[in-house]
């Protein structure tokens, strides 16, 4: 499973609708994750640049992108910012492959 974090900011219209009719937004997020074969690890609300964040586990990057696009296209959000999360083990693999790529990379104008 791939793990993603999405930071989101609601529109003023979405906030107004939630004030008038509060509901369990976490349940809605779980339904979306379930529809993609995933699960919700946690949902938190916050003050500041973003209104909340969710961490989800989904089968692959296609599912992670689909969840982000579904939320972003709903009209309820000013912003949805999604990032794949890596474990320490995955970071080690990334750094190992980066070493190989760094050795192969040639900056523009420095061709062999």
Name each model-derived stretch.
Residues 1-112:
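A compositional/biophysical signature of low hydrophobicity enriched in polar/charged and small residues
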């Amino acid at each position: 499973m791939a793990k993603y974090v999405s930071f989101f900011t609601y529109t003023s219209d979405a906030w107004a609708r939630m004030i008038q009719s509060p509901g369990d937004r976490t349940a809605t997020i779980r339904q979306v994750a379930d529809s993609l074969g995933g699960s919700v690890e946690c949902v938190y609300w916050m003050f500041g640049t973003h209104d909340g964040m969710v961490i989800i586990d989904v089968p692959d990057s296609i599912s992670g992108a689909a969840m982000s696009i579904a939320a972003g296209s709903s009209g309820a959000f000013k912003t949805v910012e999604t990032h794949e999360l890596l474990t320490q083990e995955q970071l080690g693999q990334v750094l190992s492959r980066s070493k190989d790529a760094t050795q192969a990379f040639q900056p523009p104008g420095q061709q062999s």
